[in-house]
A protein has these predicted regions:
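Hydrophobic ligand-binding cavity/cleft-lining segments
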Residues: 1-48
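Beta-strand/loop substructures that line and gate deep hydrophobic ligand-binding cavities in soluble
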Residues: 17-18, 91-146
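Short beta-edge strand/loop motif at the mouth of beta-sheet-based domains
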Residues: 19-20, 26, 39-73, 80-82, ...
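Residue-level recognition of conserved beta-strand positions in structured domain cores
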Residues: 63, 86-87, 120-122
Length: 169
């Protein structure tokens, strides 16, 4: 696990923002497909996704081992540059109040001839959720990188557990 790929947790009152930057040795179009195609998402993000890919469209995800149900409106759909959407999570035993205001922004920046810089911002999360999700999202991004590289995907739980130390403050 590489500490240089650690994200940032920015606390502002009762809310927080998670920020990650990953350099990926793949064209934006490949990364775009991996973050917007339900078949691709199912492999690395461990979710069932329905995406109405357009400005004003919707997302409907059932995510990860916990089975969080998330819906939202697509705020920006600009292939292969920006995918921004609401992240409204229904109440769940691990999130009793759910999340009603969160937004995820995936920004893909061309890096040289064939690489991509992925800037991921997960904003307007409640502070407890952000602290809980930081290492999990780190683990999912490691899985995204492995999928793009055609490597065996790392075990999410092991990666999540190993990344927890990066986000404890």
């Amino acid at each position: 696990m590489n500490a240089s790929q650690k994200g940032k947790v920015i606390i502002e009152g009762d809310y927080a923002t998670l920020k990650y930057e990953r350099r990926l040795a793949h064209p934006r179009e490949d990364v775009w497909k991996a973050i917007t195609d339900p078949k691709e998402l199912a492999m690395w993000f461990d979710n069932k996704a329905v995406i109405d890919g357009r400005n004003g469209g919707t997302i409907d995800f059932v995510s990860g081992p916990a089975g969080f149900h998330t819906t939202g409106r697509i705020l920006v759909w600009d292939p292969p540059r920006v995918f921004e959407h609401e992240w409204h999570t229904a109440p769940h035993p691990q999130l009793p109040d759910g999340e009603s205001e969160a937004v995820i922004r995936w920004e893909l920046i061309r890096d040289g001839d064939s690489g991509t810089i992925l800037n991921l911002t997960f904003s307007r999360l409640t502070k407890p959720t952000a602290l809980r999700f930081a290492s999990g999202l780190h683990a999912y991004l490691d899985r995204l990188s492995a999928q793009l590289d055609h490597r065996t995907l790392p075990d999410w739980q092991k990666t999540h557990d190993a990344a927890k130390g990066f986000y404890l403050s």
